[in-house]
């Protein structure tokens, strides 16, 4: 049994979404004590900007109030990840890649010194010991096709921040028992 699941939906199709139905079922199958649900379609995230990029490089103790404000949402998203044992992430494919709303989430959680750190031997992810289930949904881009730029990208991001246990469920196969 999983204690906490972070469920991330990003499909614009509402209740008709295959990925949304699958993330709900997979989350339920995990029998979590707690679910954190982040719906990027109904509550979209802003894109990172120059203020955010500059603030993330300032040591926490030296940040101004404006810099803290610029990072506040990012801090919240990272806290949601930190609290979760398992991430269940819907990945509806748009034009061969992830939707912009999910890419905004990726950009906001990928923070040096917070979710990963650089070493002389390369980057090290700081979120080890977590599991992720990616729920892949596409009307025309088969999972693993040479032009599937979505699943490999999201898997790489998760690996980069230390989440190595990544399973991909293809909604075309209706295998939602994960």
Predicted regions and their residues:
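Short, well-ordered beta-strand core segments
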Residues: 87, 132-133
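Short histidine/acidic/glycine/proline-rich micro-motifs that form metal-
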Residues: 12-14, 139-142
